[in-house]
Amino acid sequence: SSHELNQPGTYRDVSDTTVVAQFSVKNLSEKAESFLNKSYNDFENACKKLLGENVLTFPLDITLPESLEALTDFLNEKNVKLNGFLHAIAMDKTIRQKSVKPMLEVTADEFNDTMTVSAFSLISLSHALLKSKVLQNGASIVTLSYIAAEKVSFFPYINMSIAKAALERLTIEMAYELGRDFGIRANCVRFSPYMGSKAGNATLKIEDVERANRISPLGNANPEDLAHEVVHLFRKDIRITGEIRHVDGGFHIMG
């Protein structure tokens, strides 16, 4: 299955290598640093529990070129070649304790940090993996989003929604560019509101999820539904690319 976290973010690829992607934070308190370390340790333990003790994990600061280089060096040392990866990296400092800043109060730094981590990271990660010959020709890239990238919604996403809109547009551009050059596919999947992830738990309220469940013709999708769609898009030699797919129980068709 896949997991989208607020801090740190993660992506899971199809070769049982899992990377935790963190953004660069300066002047951390001991308490904050301890929290980040515990988050990574918890994630690493969860991966091993679900995927086996031999699963590879690697901490990554997605904002630093030297950290990306360390990742690709690690993968090459392990002789890992990727036939695809799931990008589920996201961060937004304007959401705190289920409260979101109005758009006009978002600072340039907050906007740019969210865009860099949540959208541009797709470019920097793909470039690093291709340059190092880790990502193979004919591979599949999948990104995660939600309906708020397109419409104003009752979910508490404002700044992040803009980053997700950018991520979706980048996915389409990469479908064209990487498809022409390397036969690589790129698709995006929009998922139902979900509180089982750290991001969802930090932002959504129970009533948000319940409301979406009532509105959706099939009710909210669950993580297994999302995982099945991602695995389908990872399949070899299917000519599906540049799509924004919906795994949301039909929520997106409702007015």
Regions found by a protein language model. Give the residues of each.
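Short-chain dehydrogenase/reductase
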Residues: 1-109, 122, 126-127, 171-172, 201, ...
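A glycine/serine/threonine-rich, flexible loop-to-helix segment
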Residues: 46, 158, 181, 188-216, ...
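Residue-level signal for the nucleotide or nucleotide-sugar donor/cofactor binding architecture
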Residues: 63, 120, 220-224
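Generic structural signal for alpha-helix termini and adjacent loop/cap motifs
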Residues: 78, 128, 132, 235-237
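C-terminal substrate-recognition "lid" of short-chain dehydrogenase/reductases
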Residues: 80, 219-247, 252-253
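Hydrophobic structural elements of the Rossmann-like NAD(P)H-binding subdomain
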Residues: 86, 142, 186-189, 242, ...
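Catalytic loop of short-chain dehydrogenase/reductase
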Residues: 90-181, 190-195, 219, 251
